[in-house]
Every structure is written in C-alpha cells, then in structure tokens.
C-alpha cells in the first residue's frame, strides 16, 4: 500500500482501523488493478490533450462523431467506455502511437 506514512498507518491500526487501498477494498487482482489504472491514465490523457488544444467537450465530440456526454464519460473513465475507444479517440485527436505508449508505460 502506498500514500500513507508508516507512523500514521500504525496509529490507525492500533486504533482498530483497517488500512488499505481501493484495490484491496474492492478485492481486485493485480491484473484488474493494473487495467483500472491504465484506463484512468488514458482518460486523463484524453482530458489533457483536449485542454492543451483548447477544445471543449462539444468540439471534441464533433471531431469524434460523438456526443458531449460521451466525451465526459470518456474523460471520467466510465465503465461503459472501453480502452479501445479511448485509444482510437486519442489517435483521432492527433496523439501518436508513441504518445499513447508513453501513457501506458507510465502505468507499468
């Protein structure tokens, strides 16, 4: 588990608290946790690309032939959004394969 110092963790455990991360709480396997992190990273990068180009969600939706609400779901890594859709959308918006590869590599 990361994100909490050992002293604070020990104090919480002594007080009767169980300390863990979201993956532990949800009972995710390491593979499932990695997939969730990958999807979140791609969604975040989509938001970053849109912001860097000064586009609104409506403008991105027009470029992708989609709706603003779908773009919002993509940026939020909604469960209805596939990794495939995120990657194809990033490429359509001008990201390179290398850009997408760097995002994926950061998760590993």
Language model region names:
Residues 1-41, 100-108:
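N-terminal flexible/basic segments that precede or flank functional cores
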Residues 11-16, 44-59, 88:
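Short basic helix-loop element that most often maps to the first helix and adjoining turn
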Residues 41-42, 66:
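Alpha-helix N-cap/N′ positions at the starts of helices
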Residues 53-73:
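Short alpha-helical DNA-recognition segment
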Residues 65, 76, 105:
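Residue-level detection of the helix-turn-helix DNA-binding "recognition helix"
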Residues 82-102:
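DNA major-groove recognition helix of helix-turn-helix/homeodomain DNA-binding modules
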């Amino acid at each position: 588990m990361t994100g909490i110092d050992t002293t604070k963790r020990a104090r919480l455990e002594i007080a009767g608290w169980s300390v863990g991360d979201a993956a532990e709480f949800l009972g995710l396997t390491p593979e499932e946790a990695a997939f969730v992190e990958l999807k979140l990273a791609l969604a975040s990068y989509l938001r970053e690309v849109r912001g860097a180009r000064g586009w609104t969600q409506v403008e991105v939706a027009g470029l992708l032939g989609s709706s603003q609400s779908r773009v919002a779901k993509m940026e939020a890594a909604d469960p209805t959004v596939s990794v495939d859709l995120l990657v194809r959308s990033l490429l359509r918006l001008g990201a390179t394969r290398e850009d997408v590869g760097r995002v994926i590599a950061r998760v590993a």
